[in-house]
């Protein structure tokens, strides 16, 4: 698989650009702040419908514009697919597949498969559990695009159930049973959607564990062995020896919801469900968070991405590799290890502030990025 074309309109610093891409290695070179990362971000957005830098879509739209458009043409085993995404702040995105509108933007997931390495990856090790949950869900959705609907449904249930919890305590005090009956209905929805989400994550972690272990050994052969484990907020799920059925997870969630009912009513928040779970990262007998050195943290973050790459390759479709300024962050040995893996990929798109950040023995197409002033302010452009 490779991206043959990227077109942007009013995306970040790009007023307009049409880039013809090709298999192999391409390096986008330019000073920081000139817009090279925005190109990689656009491709990642086309693959996942999300940015690796911001949580909302509003910053993706160029200042003064009403919407941004990201267009990609992807080639997979000789077949071309064109994806057009229209991003509008505060409204649902619109999407077209091969120029035909689709009902939901989620229908384009899976057309472009990609793995992104970026400086933000350190948050996978040092950040909050939400960063690690997002990593798992993005990878699971890349492999099974239908899971995007499960995630959306679950998030909606959590929001609505939380709103109900904030009013239910007072209703119960007044003896109003109807609110509690409604809460029980939402418990069923949360357990059903949550069970599907937990099942996908637990299965993914089981498959990912050996790949992360191997990747970490490649990156840091003298360090302690790496391991990952899914940690659930529900005791019955946490104590299960391995992947279980969706029905098992649903029953466990319903039981936990019943037992935590009083605590949830008192606090007005959902205390049970996969939105409170975590991916535990360990080095030897210690958790990586709080105990790993800077170099070990980088190795673990890279191992998670390399593990994702190997897992996607095992599915039969090699993903596009996106490397956003990561070579500049790495020491010589880790840079060499990453370059070895990336060098064999079908397509690698790299950003760098200076050409010297790229491995010397890489034969790569080089694209210079510039910044110019126009009537709308500073805009990025490709040097001719």
Curated annotation (Swiss-Prot):
Similarity section: Belongs to the RecF family.
Coiled coil: none
Matches recorded under InterPro entries: DNA-binding_RecF, DNA-binding_RecF_CS, P-loop_NTPase, RecF/RecN/SMC_N, RecF_2
One Gene Ontology term of the molecular function aspect: ATP binding
Protein name: DNA replication and repair protein RecF
Amino-acid positions noted as binding ATP in the UniProt annotation, renumbered to this chain: 30-37
PROSITE patterns found in the cross-reference section: RECF_1, RECF_2
Species per Swiss-Prot/TrEMBL record: Mycolicibacterium smegmatis (strain ATCC 700084 / mc(2)155) (Mycobacterium smegmatis)
Pfam family name, one: SMC_N
Function: The RecF protein is involved in DNA metabolism; it is required for DNA replication and normal SOS inducibility. RecF binds preferentially to single-stranded, linear DNA. It also seems to bind ATP.
GO biological process terms held by the UniProt record: DNA replication; DNA synthesis involved in DNA repair; double-strand break repair; SOS response
Gene Ontology cellular component list: cytoplasm
Gene3D superfamilies: P-loop containing nucleotide triphosphate hydrolases, RecF/RecN/SMC, N-terminal domain
Keyword Ubl conjugation attached: no
Top-level lineage group: Bacteria
Annotated localization: Cytoplasm
Keywords tagged on the record: ATP-binding, Cytoplasm, DNA damage, DNA repair, DNA replication, DNA-binding, Nucleotide-binding, SOS response
UniProt KW Metal-binding keyword: no
């Amino acid at each position: 698989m490779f991206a043959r074309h990227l077109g942007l309109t009013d995306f970040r610093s790009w007023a307009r650009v049409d880039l013809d891409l090709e298999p192999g290695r391409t390096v986008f070179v330019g000073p920081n702040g000139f817009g090279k990362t925005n190109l990689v971000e656009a491709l990642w957005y086309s693959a996942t419908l999300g940015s690796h830098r911001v949580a909302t879509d509003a910053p993706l739209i160029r200042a003064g514009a009403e919407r941004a458009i990201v267009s990609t043409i992807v080639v997979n085993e000789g077949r071309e697919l064109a994806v057009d995404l229209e991003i509008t702040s505060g409204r649902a995105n619109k999407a077209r597949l091969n120029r035909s509108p689709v009902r939901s933007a989620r229908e384009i997931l899976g057309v472009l498969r990609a793995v992104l390495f970026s400086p933000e990856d350190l948050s996978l090790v040092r950040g909050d559990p939400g960063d690690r949950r997002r990593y798992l869900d993005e990878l699971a959705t890349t492999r099974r695009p239908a899971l995007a609907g499960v995630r959306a449904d679950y998030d909606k249930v959590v929001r609505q159930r939380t709103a109900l919890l904030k009013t239910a305590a007072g209703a119960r005090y007044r003896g109003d049973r109807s609110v509690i009956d409604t809460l029980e209905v939402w418990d069923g929805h949360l357990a059903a959607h949550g069970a599907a989400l937990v099942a996908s994550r637990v299965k993914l972690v089981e498959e990912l564990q050996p790949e992360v272990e191997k990747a970490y050994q490649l990156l840091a052969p003298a360090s302690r062995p790496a391991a990952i484990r899914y940690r659930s907020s529900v005791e019955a799920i946490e104590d299960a020896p391995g992947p279980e059925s969706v029905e098992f997870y649903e029953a466990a969630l319903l039981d936990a919801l019943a037992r935590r009912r009083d605590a949830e009513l008192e606090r007005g928040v959902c205390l049970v469900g996969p939105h409170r779970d975590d991916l535990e990262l360990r080095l030897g007998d210690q958790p990586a968070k709080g105990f790993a050195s800077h170099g070990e943290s980088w190795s673990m973050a890279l191992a998670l991405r390399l593990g994702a790459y190997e897992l996607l390759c095992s599915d039969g479709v090699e993903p596009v590799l996106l490397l956003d300024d990561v070579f500049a962050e790495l020491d010589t040995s880790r840079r060499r290890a990453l370059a070895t893996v990336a060098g064999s990929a079908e397509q690698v798109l790299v950003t760098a502030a200076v050409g010297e950040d790229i491995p010397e023995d890489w034969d790569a197409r080089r694209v210079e990025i510039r910044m110019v002033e126009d009537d709308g302010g500073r805009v990025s452009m490709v040097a001719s």
